[in-house]
Amino acid sequence: TIDINLQNAVQEELESTIEKFSADSGVSLLINIKNGEILSLNNFPDFNPNRINLSNTNGRFNRALQANYEMGSTFKPITVAMGIDENIINKEMLFDVSKPINSIRDYHPFIGSLSVKDIVVQSSNIGAAKIAYKIGKKKQIEFFRKIGFFEKVNIQIKEAAPPLGNKNNWGKLETMTIGFGHGFAVTP
């Protein structure tokens, strides 16, 4: 389902962005949200399969399918969706985010409380951690299982990496840190 024109345009943009930010590597993945088809999958550095003997292993590593990444703050909306899906929270609820929880802090500290919406908009780790704790480990695991987070990506490439994370044995702190995208890693 790769669209070669889109693939080439995205590859050029990826290379340009990597150069602009002096990055060592990068990956892009465009998916049709209606049916899950992969429209473009790009890696940099890459290699010419017709001249594989001239490439190094770094160029042959498929970062889109073989590497796992912690999702970080991009995971906060999933935590909120989980809480709403389980009828544990609603968008009007407020959470006090004024004090750190153990080692969990916000990059920009907040005074008082934030709504569920503002926890996502303002990217509050403390707020996402509190929502995740309210959801609880059991429901968190059930939700992850339901959406396939414990499964290897269902793609016809044998090198696809399975998710990383101790899916059967995490405690209170892990439940909270997973709420803002740390402690669990998946392929893009």
Task: Put a short name on every predicted segment.
Residues 1-26:
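Conserved, well-ordered alpha-helix/loop/beta-strand core segments that scaffold catalytic motifs
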Residues 2, 26-73, 78-188:
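Beta-lactam-recognizing serine transpeptidase/beta-lactamase-like catalytic domain environment
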